[in-house]
């Protein structure tokens, strides 16, 4: 048996060490490798010996469950080498606080080596030959994602590194574009987006009840991440060409994207 905790040892969920997906495949749950606002991430291994990451949703509220199901659906729909790869999903029976029997949702995905923030903390600024193909790949991946949804939560922690590939992950705050999939449960004036990385329209929406957050917001956020990679500093203030050390074309595209114009 394994005890799952969510930043609180007094709130635990005990599950069997083997979980079974909706397709009938079973996985052994190993060590914890991450923790978020509503869930925990563990390493897991299948019968063939392949190692993956499994995310357990430890919030039982309907709002959290709806967001989680939308996240899983988006992982299934959006396929690209620079988007986190879906493997399987399902539910597992758990004992909550040694008392109640509850159902815990989980999703299994490819396992990364680390996230971009951890990488930047332990490394100098990457060379052009390393970051340029990753920037291009992430932009292409975002274009694929935008066929279905808006991410709204792009930050270095949500960009994972697997081998030499940077992968966009964590679709928990995504807003679907199609009416049949769309169920935006974000309240008016609810903060959407991470500190340091919020777009002008996200700030306007949060503080002043402004317009909806659209695709341009994602472009703004991912280009702020690119600035972080290129400068090794958290973004803030007014940027100029002198602040960013890269090729003229990349510099021009980034500065255009992080302007305060909603339509750029």
Q: Where do the language-model regions lie?
A:
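Protein kinase glycine-rich loop
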Residues: 30-36, 41
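Juxta-kinase regulatory segment immediately upstream of eukaryotic protein kinase catalytic domains
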Residues: 1-22, 30
């Amino acid at each position: 048996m394994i005890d799952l905790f969510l930043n609180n040892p007094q709130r635990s969920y005990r599950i069997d060490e083997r979980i079974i997906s909706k397709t009938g495949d079973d996985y052994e749950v190993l060590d914890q490798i991450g923790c978020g606002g509503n869930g925990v991430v563990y390493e897991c291994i299948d019968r063939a010996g392949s190692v993956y990451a499994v995310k357990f949703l430890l919030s039982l509220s309907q709002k959290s469950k709806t967001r989680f199901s939308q996240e899983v659906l988006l992982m299934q729909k959006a396929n690209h080498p620079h988007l986190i790869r879906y493997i399987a999903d399902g539910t597992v029976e758990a004992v909550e606080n040694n008392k109640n029997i509850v159902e815990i949702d989980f999703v299994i995905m490819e396992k990364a080596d680390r996230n971009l923030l951890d990488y930047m903390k332990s490394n100098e600024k990457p060379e052009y030959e390393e970051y340029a193909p990753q920037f291009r790949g992430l932009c292409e991946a975002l274009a694929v994602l935008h066929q279905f949804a808006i991410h709204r939560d792009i930050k270095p922690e949500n960009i994972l590194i697997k081998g030499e590939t940077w992968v966009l992950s964590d679709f928990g705050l995504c807003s679907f574009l199609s009416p049949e999939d769309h169920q935006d449960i974000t309240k008016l004036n609810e903060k959407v987006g991470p500190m340091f990385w919020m777009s002008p329209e996200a700030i306007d929406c949060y503080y002043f009840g402004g317009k909806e957050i659209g695709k341009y917001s994602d472009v703004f956020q991912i280009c702020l991440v690119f600035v972080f990679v290129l400068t090794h500093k958290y973004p803030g203030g007014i940027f100029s060409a002198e602040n960013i050390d890269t090729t003229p074309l990349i510099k021009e595209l980034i500065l255009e994207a992080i302007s305060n114009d909603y339509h750029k």
